[in-house]
Curated annotation (Swiss-Prot):
Induction (free text): Expressed at the early exponential growth phase, decreases through exponential phase and reaches a steady-state level at post-exponential phase. Repressed by MgrA and SarA. Activated by Rot and SarT. Transcription is also dependent on SigA and SigB factors. Is activated by SigB in strains harboring an intact sigB operon (rsbU, rsbV, rsbW, and sigB).
Further remarks about this protein from its record: Mutational analysis of the spa promoter suggests that SarS might stimulate spa transcription by competing with SarA.
Domain of life, source organism: Bacteria
Taxonomic classification: Bacteria, Bacillati, Bacillota, Bacilli, Bacillales
Entries under Pfam families matching the protein: Staph_reg_Sar_Rot
Name of the featured protein: HTH-type transcriptional regulator SarS
One GO MF term attached to the UniProt entry: DNA-binding transcription factor activity
Length: 250
């Protein structure tokens, strides 16, 4: 399937598809979550012995509750230490000793190797894919920021938005459900739920083919097409604004 000329949106859909394939392949093979790898990458490249927890929350787009849980795991395995400020106990800091930094460096090197090996096997031709852990971190945060933009300005999930982008890119605006599932790189139940939500809100039409009832068609009428194009243009403009760019490391 070809996407339309909304370049920024197309880039993010490509990145999201890459991340989906990466997580699916790598997750069963490593003894650490991707988020924990990313957190260690962040701490390693900060090159600070002590970091306020508030700064980590500000820099990374993860939920604070998620970060708390992952930090607990890293503390448990002695990658980092957690200390409270003597001045104000409400302020928490992450502390890293030289020994811990060496241990973190080994994990970051492993993450670099995992990314390179996956890229070699994946054979993606996109220039957007990350070459190492630092680029992976930036792209992950950028895509999460993108999802926040969609949720805030359009009140749509990323899956719902991706479906709209794919359908509007088709010449006749007709997509088979089977083809959509193969293209979107999200789990089947999640995709079907998003489709049903879009149909309920009047964004698209979902119906069985009159020629073959086993086939489910997804398409839009002219008004729905115009509305979707306006939404895509709005998001593309937001993404084109460099003030909205969220990169942890330049």
């Amino acid at each position: 399937m070809k996407y339309n000329n909304h370049d920024k949106i197309r880039d993010f859909i490509i990145i999201e598809a890459y991340m989906f394939r990466f997580k699916k392949k790598v997750k069963p093979e490593v003894d650490m979550t991707i988020k924990e790898f990313i957190l260690l990458t962040y701490l390693f490249h900060q090159q600070e012995n002590t970091l306020p927890f508030k700064k980590i929350v500000s820099d990374l787009c993860y939920k604070q509750s998620d970060l708390v849980q992952h930090i607990k795991v890293l503390v448990k395995h002695s990658y980092i230490s957690k200390v409270r400020s003597k001045i104000d106990e409400r302020n928490t800091y992450i502390s890293i000793s030289e020994e811990q930094r060496e241990k973190i460096a080994e994990r970051v090197t492993l993450f670099d190797q995992i990314i390179k090996q996956f890229n070699l096997a994946d054979q993606s031709e996109s220039q957007m894919i990350p070459k190492d852990s630092k680029e992976f971190l930036n792209l992950m945060m950028y895509t999460m920021y993108f999802k926040n933009i969609i949720k805030k300005h359009l009140t749509l999930s990323f899956v719902e938005f991706t479906i709209l982008a794919i359908i509007t890119s088709q010449n006749k605006n007709i997509v088979l459900l089977k083809d959509l599932i193969e293209t979107i790189h999200h789990k089947y139940p999640q995709t079907v739920r998003a489709l049903n939500n879009l149909k309920k809100q009047g964004y698209l039409i979902k119906e069985r083919s009159t020629e073959d009832e086993r086939k489910i068609l997804i398409h839009m009428d002219d008004a729905q097409q115009d509305h979707a194009e306006q939404l895509l243009a709005q998001v593309n403009q937001l993404l084109a604004d460099k003030d909205h760019l969220h990169l942890v490391f330049e």
